[in-house]
């Protein structure tokens, strides 16, 4: 059976209230991030809209603020709503992170589903 996308990890590898970066195309740096909050998963391109291509994490898998309720860009401190990706504070106010399609299979495996070109 064909997998439903590119395997990222298993659901239990991202604890609730935590985040993790991924490099599904083996580019040498994380190109997407996944946040698990309240049982839901939110996936975004790992690039700040203020300066396109700037990675968000300040260290490996560190995408969230101290309160673990916002995604933070390490380059200039912009803060983003986890569920919507909307910038709520910082130089990109009103801009949004780019969403990424993911799927959780019945066995708990998380897959990235690239958009068709």
Question: Model segments located where?
Answer:
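Short Gly/Pro-enriched turn/cap motifs at secondary-structure boundaries
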Residues: 92-93
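N-terminal pre-ligand scaffold of iron-sulfur
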Residues: 1-67, 81-82, 96-117
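A conserved acidic, glycine/proline-rich C-terminal tail/linker
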Residues: 77, 87-88
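Short cysteine clusters
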Residues: 48, 73-76
């Amino acid at each position: 059976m064909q997998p439903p996308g590119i395997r990222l990890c298993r659901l239990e590898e991202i604890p609730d209230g935590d985040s993790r970066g991924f490099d599904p195309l083996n580019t040498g740096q994380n190109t997407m991030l996944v946040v698990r909050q309240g049982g839901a998963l939110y996936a975004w391109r790992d690039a700040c809209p203020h300066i396109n291509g700037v990675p968000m994490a300040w260290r490996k898998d560190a995408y969230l603020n101290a309160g673990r309720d916002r995604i933070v860009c390490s380059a200039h401190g912009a803060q983003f709503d986890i569920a919507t990706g909307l910038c709520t504070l910082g130089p990109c106010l009103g801009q949004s992170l780019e969403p990424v399609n993911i799927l959780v299979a019945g066995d708990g495996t998380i897959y990235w589903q690239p958009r068709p070109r």
